Amino acid sequence: MKKKLIALSLLVGAIQFSCTDDLDLLNTDPTKAAASTFDPNLLLPSIQFEHVNANAGYNGPILFQSMWVQVLASTTSGAANYYSNADKYVISGNTNDYMQRTWNIDYKAASFAYEMEQLTKGKPALANLNSIAIIMQAQCLAAIADTYGDIPYTQALQAKTGTTLPVYDTQESVYKSLLTRIETATNALNPSSPIATNDAFAYKGNVAQWKKYGYSLMLKLAMRLAKADAATAKTFAEKAAAGGVFSSVNDDAYVQTDDSKGFGNANGQALSTLADVYQVRWSKTMIDYLKSTNDPRLGKVAEVPADGLVANQSMTSAGNSTPAAQIGLPNGFDLNGGTTDISKAPGYPGGTGAGADATPIGKYSRPTMIYRNRSAPLFVLTYAETELLLAEAVVRGFNVGGTAAQHYKNGVIAGMQSLAKFGSGATIDAAVATAYADANPLVTANALKQINEQYWATTGLLMNFSEAWNNWKRSGFPVLTPVNYVGNFSNGAIPRRQPYPTGEATLNTANYQTAVGKLTGGDNWVSRTWWDK
């Protein structure tokens, strides 16, 4: 039976949320339940689904970050074409809506987590759930801070007590508070106490895995600060490693969606629409990277459609996945017949089909059908990411144990293993993954470049576009050539943040203006936030 989410008036300030979707059909409606009788376990899947929903489909990253960091590419352009936000940095008809969805939905998730924290506070039988509530708040609020910069934090989620116009806290203070809260909450998780009973992660309440997740999240947030505050990064990265981070792909944090029950994979839903099937392709940057080392993932993730427009628009016909046949679409081109027409791109391979069935982009690689699976997982944090971050931590001189080379090898293999969660069609044999990692070891002279390019590829291929973008901002890798399409909103630079929701300027004006005053260049797409050095 489909269930409804809990309606809570806990949202930050006076946020106006966009329309709900299928993921809002999860929990039994307990709006008449008293706090003394309501089971806060019911809130956990709402938090988890809202968070992954904030980072999937048309709620933002596929329409922005996926092409900003050149994982995907698209020939769509113009005000009516939503991928112009991403591929060409050009405003579309709904950009103002799209750019506020991560804010709105992740604050919604954080509000559920805050309520779960309050309902479990001081109750020994719910102590583990209390810790999980704090960890999930950190996951959601960090995602908002990564995307926008300074955000409401100390006064956020307080509408029930009358605070509807919250002040903005600096990204620095938010991060340092989150790291401390994660540490305290993760340390408090106790395998001897009752487990969470309504967990949408694959953990199903397993306290040992939640503990690893908390420390792995701490590691990720610590490494965000590697350039902005190396001392804090080192302290918390070392604490995370000592506490115990992910140790295998079985620890991956993800939500397994189920379209038949009304909460499908929003990326799969997007990539199953006719326009997306046809005009969303893998970027040349990504395909060239995978081909440069004969990465075995290439034959699992990319295909060239059969010849002709009809085949290119087919959602059910598999294409040619032979690695040698794959060609990535360069970002920044269109089908408009002018100087930026795809036919003018360097090395243009020509189209396929003839007459009414002709298509100029028919030889470019698109995502395979594993990505059109509406019941595929939505990843939050993986073992592969954790190992690659540990590799970088070693390179930076942090005392996290192990060698950079071994952590890197583990991360490379894990990235291939995690891909199998999309289905049997994405499985890479363990021997193949190991042989690839052995043939492509970490080279000391290029260590940071190698590690972070692998991180970009792994998160991108797992459709975690916001994480690929955030780590690119932090590390500078891969080195990308920006698009400078006519009429773009970033002066030909790759966007480094999303502007605040328009409602903040009109409803929370004074606090919004204070926050904007701290941004060099103002509330635009290229102002750098505190940790983005």
Model-inferred region functions:
Residues M1-T28:
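Bacterial Sec-dependent N-terminal signal peptides
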Residues S173-Q256:
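Internal, well-ordered domain-core segments that constitute the primary functional module
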Residues C19-Q70, S74-T75, N104, E115, ...:
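Membrane-proximal, proline-rich intrinsically disordered regions
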Residues A233-L390, V395-R396, G401, A405-Q454, ...:
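Hydrophobic-face positions in mid-chain alpha helices that act as interaction patches
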Residues S77-P152, Q158-T197, N373-L378:
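Conserved, well-structured interaction surfaces
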Residues V395, I413-K533:
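C-terminal functional modules
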